[in-house]
């Protein structure tokens, strides 16, 4: 129809998700300012993540907020722990406030 054509490149899976060391360190330091119990010794995981496309363009870090014991995020029995919201919001606010220049 309409004499159009398209070339499609379909690739299965995602690129490897690799955190930039300095961004990971920055995120951990920010977390330690707002909450106790930051685990810097979390073992690497082999997860497919579309965020890896962003990390291929700009340095960054795929960071995780602890949510207690129980099923993980993609499990059908997963239940987000609302008690983690204040710590998570404070963590992100700390990173933003630290990185952005103050105005005024």
What are these regions (language model features)?
Residues 1-104:
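Metal-dependent amide/peptide-bond hydrolase catalytic core
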């Amino acid at each position: 129809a309409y004499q159009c054509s398209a070339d499609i490149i379909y690739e299965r899976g995602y690129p490897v998700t690799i955190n930039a060391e300095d961004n990971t360190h920055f995120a951990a330091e920010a977390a330690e300012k707002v909450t106790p119990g930051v685990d810097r010794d979390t073992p690497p995981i082999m997860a497919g993540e579309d965020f890896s496309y962003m990390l291929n363009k700009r340095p960054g870090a795929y960071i995780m907020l602890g949510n207690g014991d129980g099923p993980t995020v993609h499990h059908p029995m997963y239940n987000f722990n609302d008690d983690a919201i204040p710590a998570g919001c404070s963590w992100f606010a700390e990173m933003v406030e630290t990185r952005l220049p103050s105005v005024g």
